[in-house]
C-alpha cells in the first residue's frame, strides 16, 4: 500500500538551519529554548532539550538546511521509501545525525531537503516535564 507521510506515522523530529554565524544562532536558541548546545565540529552545532532538537550549520542566513521527520516504526519508514520510489523521486542519503542508518532524504519541488528515518535514542541529559 502506498502511504503518505501522515499515514506512515511521520512527525517533525528536528530542524537544521543555515547561518552565516552558526555559533551565535545556536547560542541564541540554546538560551531562548533552554537547550544544551554542543559544537561537534567547525561545521555543526546541535541544540538539544527534552522533546526538541535543532542543528545549525554554516550557510546562508534564513535558510532551512533540512527538516527531519521521524517515523514511528520500520513498517512506516519502509512504506514511505517505497512510495517515494514509485513516485520516481530521487532517494538521497540522509544528512541527519538523529536517525538510524536506514534513513533517507528527498528534495521537494523548491529544493528543500526532507529527511525520513527512525529516531535514535535521545542523548540529552535535561529532565522533561
Q: Which residues are covered by each model-predicted region?
A:
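N-terminal beta-strand motif that seeds the catalytic metal site of vicinal oxygen chelate
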Residues: 1-23, 64-69, 127-129
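Residues within well-ordered alpha-helical secondary structure of globular protein domains
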Residues: 31, 83-86
Amino acid at each position: 500500500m502506498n502511504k503518505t507521510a501522515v499515514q506512515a506515522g511521520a512527525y517533525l523530529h528536528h530542524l537544521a538551519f543555515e547561518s552565516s554565524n552558526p555559533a551565535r544562532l545556536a547560542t541564541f536558541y540554546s538560551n531562548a529554548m533552554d537547550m544544551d548546545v554542543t559544537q561537534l565540529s567547525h561545521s555543526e552545532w546541535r541544540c538539544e532539550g527534552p522533546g526538541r532538537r535543532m542543528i545549525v550549520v554554516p550557510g546562508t542566513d534564513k535558510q532551512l538546511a533540512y527538516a527531519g521527520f521521524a517515523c514511528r516504526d520500520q513498517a512506516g519508514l519502509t512504506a514511505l521509501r517505497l512510495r517515494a520510489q514509485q513516485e520516481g523521486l530521487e532517494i538521497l542519503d540522509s544528512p541527519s545525525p538523529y536517525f538510524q542508518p536506514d534513513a533517507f532524504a528527498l528534495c521537494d519541488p523548491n529544493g528543500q531537503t526532507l529527511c525520513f528515518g527512525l529516531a535514535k535514542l535521545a542523548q540529552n541529559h535535561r529532565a522533561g516535564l
